Amino acid sequence: MLRKAKKTMVRTVFLRIGIGLVVLLLPLGYRCVAEDNGAISRGYEAVTTDFGNFYLDRGNLTKLGIGVGVAAVFANTEMDQYIRDKYQNSTRSHVTDQATNIFNISGTELALIAVPVYVGTYGAGLWLHNPTMVEWARKSVRATVVGGPALVFLAVATGGDRPTDGDSHWNPFQNTHGVSGHTYIGAVPFITAAKMSGKTYQKAIFYGLSTFPGLARINDDEHYFSQVALGWFLAYLSCAVVEKGTDRQEGRVHVQLAPVPKGLAITVQKRY
């Protein structure tokens, strides 16, 4: 059963990564080969930059370590169990069940919903010449992809159980529920929107919405608080490194040489 759960989780993450890379590498139009090659080059550069900023940057690794440490305190003491019992016995009701119904699907199903949404938004943005839609879709996919390996590793390495299966204490490599993948996948699009928003109230709304998938898991007794919190924090860090990579790329002058019919083309692009 454990082996099957691990295979399912790994398969889901690799599905997201594979389709995500396809989206990232989609050429921005078909007007010339040089433009297509430029899109592929930018997509590859964005992915490698994101992974470097997440897994090699000391500042990000420090933040991740702090997040894991805080989650460990909640998970390996009675704090997680107290929060779970308090909520289930005193707060959960028919009203909260109805309110969280929209998120009452598995992480795998949520991933399979998110991918077409991102692809559809990306395509619609290109068709409508709406750069905001394109940017949101690409950043959301990049964030989902970059944090995927960390999510899988931590979920398995911590070995946490669901509330209905056991206590919150970590049992390394004994289970796959130490981090809420549902929370992670569900939070990314809202955190991305928050980071793209220019007004404080808009940021507050989107950040608030980003917590709903995790709260639904707590309400449905599918995850402990620490598992949800760590899933959300991973989503936040993933979105932050994507934003960091985008900021670093702005202002660069890109010069590219590409073959075209009857010769070569040189393209020069500066981002603002």
Roles of regions detected by a PLM:
Residues 64-72, 118-121:
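Short, glycine/alanine-rich hydrophobic alpha-helices that insert into or span membranes
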Residues 75, 123-124:
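Juxtamembrane "helix exit" motif at the C-terminal ends of alpha-helical transmembrane segments
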Residues 70-81:
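Alpha-helical transmembrane segments of multi-pass membrane proteins
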Residues 82-91, 99, 166-174:
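Flexible, solvent-exposed loop segments that connect beta-strands
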Residues 95-117:
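Interfacial helix-start motif at the membrane-water boundary
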